[in-house]
Regions:
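Thiamine diphosphate
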Residues: 1-117
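Active-site metal-binding loops of divalent metal-dependent hydrolases
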Residues: 124-127
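Glycine-rich ThDP/TPP pyrophosphate-binding loop and its adjacent helix/strand module
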Residues: 116-119, 130-148, 152-230
Length: 230
């Protein structure tokens, strides 16, 4: 049993996750395994696999409603090896903050060993750039809790038949912006610049980055860098 402590507990600061030097240096252990029901060739499943492989086994993942909720939580089964929790569509940030605060409280009371445990909250652009933006913004104003928020940018509400989102680029054809006879370009709003907006508006946020899974090692190293910074 761990002993209670009145000291401030920083969950992630003590760990140092070195960057991977290449594909051949990646660990063999998998924490997001086969058996999920994503579509063939789905990149979101690859993102989940690489994200949690980079983070390691001492990780809690929280995911908002979307494809990665529907496809990975078949009744009585899951592809997640690490603890995973579903959150409502707009609450990934607040759920991640609550998980980090709960871990910190349990460690302070001596009910958990004081060690770095990664808390990663995952959402799509609908749950991040639109409905979940306020929760993410509120989470980033609490620098004493360490939460990594990862937004997968589909540039649409992809789980519900490609509707328009705040991350949809100008001129895109979606089910909410089909081309018409009078106006061929129906979507005339510009895509939100989420990275710049979060970085500029939250000076206590310690890390903001953008990645592309075509460069998977670089993406995994960005996850490790964020978790090391805390």
């Amino acid at each position: 049993m761990a002993t209670p402590s009145n000291e401030w507990v920083n969950l992630n600061a003590p760990q140092k996750l070195d960057p991977f030097k290449g594909v051949k240096k990646l660990p063999l252990e998998e924490y997001f395994t086969s058996g999920h029901r994503t579509c063939q060739g789905c990149e979101s499943a690859l993102v989940m696999r690489m994200m949690v492989k980079a983070a390691g086994p001492r990780t809690i993942v929280l995911g908002s409603t979307g494809c990665m909720y529907v496809a990975n939580t078949t009744y009585y089964s899951t592809s997640w090896v690490v603890p995973w929790m579903h959150t409502q569509l707009g609450s990934s940030g607040s759920a991640g903050l609550g998980a980090a605060a709960g871990l910190k409280a349990l460690m302070r009371k001596g009910k958990l060993k004081q060690e770095p445990i990664n808390v990663i909250a995952f959402c799509g652009d609908g749950g991040g750039a639109d409905m979940g933006l306020s929760a993410i913004s509120a989470t980033l104003t609490h620098p004493d809790y360490n939460v990594l928020i990862l937004m997968y940018d589909n540039e649409s509400y992809a789980n519900t038949d490609i509707q328009l989102s705040g991350s949809t680029p100008y001129g895109a054809h979606t089910t909410f912006s089909p081309p018409g006879k009078a106006r061929r370009i129906m979507h005339r709003r510009w895509k939100k610049n989420m990275a710049a907006m979060l970085a500029a508006g939250h000076p206590t946020c310690r890390y903001v980055g953008t990645v592309c899974m075509s460069y998977s090692v670089q993406a995994m190293n960005s996850v490790r860098k964020a978790l090391s910074i805390g």
